[in-house]
């Protein structure tokens, strides 16, 4: 089941959970989508600012598997 997150802090909390398996980063021309897979839900965060997206990518937990799509 997908869920959308609007706050960056909420996304980072979800990414640091124990059941978070992987993060997919999908880059589009107008936005960047971060999708974190947890045991029950797939949480999605949409960011339109490219600089914020790069900062968020750097602040992801190191043990998490990160996959970039496009």
Curated annotation (Swiss-Prot):
A Pfam family that the UniProt record links to this protein: Ribosomal_L38e
GO terms for biological process, alphabetical: protein-RNA complex assembly; translation
Keyword Ribonucleoprotein annotated: yes
Domain of life: Eukaryota
Entry keyword set: Ribonucleoprotein, Ribosomal protein
InterPro entries named among the record's database cross-references: Ribosomal_eL38, Ribosomal_eL38_sf
Coiled-coil ranges from the UniProt annotation: none
A single GO cellular-component term on record: cytosolic large ribosomal subunit
Presence of keyword Methyltransferase: no
Gene Ontology terms for molecular function: structural constituent of ribosome
Family under the similarity heading: Belongs to the eukaryotic ribosomal protein eL38 family.
Protein name (database record): Large ribosomal subunit protein eL38
Taxonomic lineage of the native organism: Eukaryota, Metazoa, Ecdysozoa, Arthropoda, Hexapoda
């Amino acid at each position: 089941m997908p869920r959308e997150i609007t706050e960056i802090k909420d996304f980072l909390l979800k990414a640091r959970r124990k059941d978070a398996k992987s993060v997919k980063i999908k880059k589009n021309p107008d936005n960047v989508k971060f999708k974190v897979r947890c045991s029950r839900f797939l949480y999605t965060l949409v960011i339109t600012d490219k600089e914020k997206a790069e900062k968020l990518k750097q602040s992801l937990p190191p043990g998490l598997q990160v996959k970039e799509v496009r």
